[in-house]
Amino acid sequence: MRSVSRPGAIVFALLFVLESLARATLLTVIPLQAYALLGEAREVSLLYVLVGIAGLASSFAIPLLIRRFRRRRVYVLGAVLLIATAALLATRTLAGQAVAMLCLAVGTAALNITLSLYVMDYIRKRDLVRSEPLRMGFSALAWSVGPLLGVTLYEKLGHGSAELLSACFSVLLLLYFAYLRLTENPAVAAATRPIADPRANIRRFVAQPRLRLAWTIAFVRSVYWSMFFTYPPVYLVQQGIGGTAAGLLASGGNVLLLAAPLFGRLAGRTGLRRPIMAAMIGGGLMCMLATIGYHLPVLVALCLLGGAVGAVILDALGSVPFLRAVHPYERPQMTTVYRTYIDLASLLPAILYSVLLVFFDLRAVFVTTGLAMFSGALVAHWLPRRM
């Protein structure tokens, strides 16, 4: 009982599971509904661009909110925004879709930043290589079942059903968080620097080579997942296969998260550099193979699942370089800058994809993602051997 009621790796993993269930239930529904409302893959990309810009700008306000209202209330705000996301999506209007996607982006940022701060307060640096894969492994069920369950409800019971289930998971998250009554580590809170201008935080982040390296690795990882959860569903619908297959593909990629603890143990023996580089190279190769077999949907799906293996390895290990490198006294500021990889990995590729899709089909998306993975492998070569 103590393991689920006192701050530690299991408690933080359970919080992430409930958050993941709320988000994963809508994971495939969001791009499918956007495609149904807009009718073109390029228009879907443009919607993601606009939401990404707004979400990125909003995320820089989170340290100010944490300082003004404290971390606990900002976490609650993030969960409430997930509930708002579900309610707005249920309207099945373009305006509701756009605002829902923005609420999801800001809510996810609030939850991600505050949970990362709690993890750094309570988990020792040498234990991160075990606790982070454990968190991902715990969430495997959510990300495996959620996308398929959500799209099945969406197609069989109609709009509103998947959204209702997502909102219920968000309510459970709020109740569990209230039960835990988490507090900030007083020693760390006392050492935290005052909130500076966001531009000063960015300059401070960029001035630290290890933080730049950690951000790049996380960015490339998120580029793959952003592609995987957005464009393959559109591709499968274009091929006449349907939304259920898209849900199966998303769930199949996420079930691989069950292996995350194994990758954590592997990194404990070999270090981070080799498995991270291998994951990126393998993911890039799978994207290129998907491009070659573009007119064979089953082959494309299998290749993208193969690439998801590499992305799961990066999920298990990719956050560890940042968590080990960041200084305790500037965690809120640096965490906010670091997690911009999530918004930028959706925003920047979406801008590029919007241009490419004017001239090419979805093969251009797969090729671009593969090149990003190869580039990430080159950057990961600079990871210190002892990290």
Regions found by a protein language model. Name each.
Residues 104-139:
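Cytoplasmic helix-loop-helix junction between adjacent transmembrane helices
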Residues 58-70, 259-272, 357-358:
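Helix-to-loop junctions at the C-terminal end of transmembrane segments
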Residues 162-179, 366-381:
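Symmetry-related core transmembrane helices of the 12-TM Major Facilitator Superfamily/SLC fold
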Residues 2-52, 210-249:
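Helix-loop boundary and gating motifs at the non-cytosolic
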Residues 73-87, 167, 274-289:
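Structural signature of the two symmetry-related core transmembrane helices
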Residues 17, 96-110, 219, 298-313:
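Hydrophobic core of transmembrane alpha-helices in multi-pass small-molecule transporters
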Residues 1-6, 184-216:
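Juxtamembrane intracellular "pre-TM" segments in multi-pass secondary transporters
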Residues 30, 110-123, 313-326:
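Intracellular juxtamembrane helix-capping segments at the cytosolic ends
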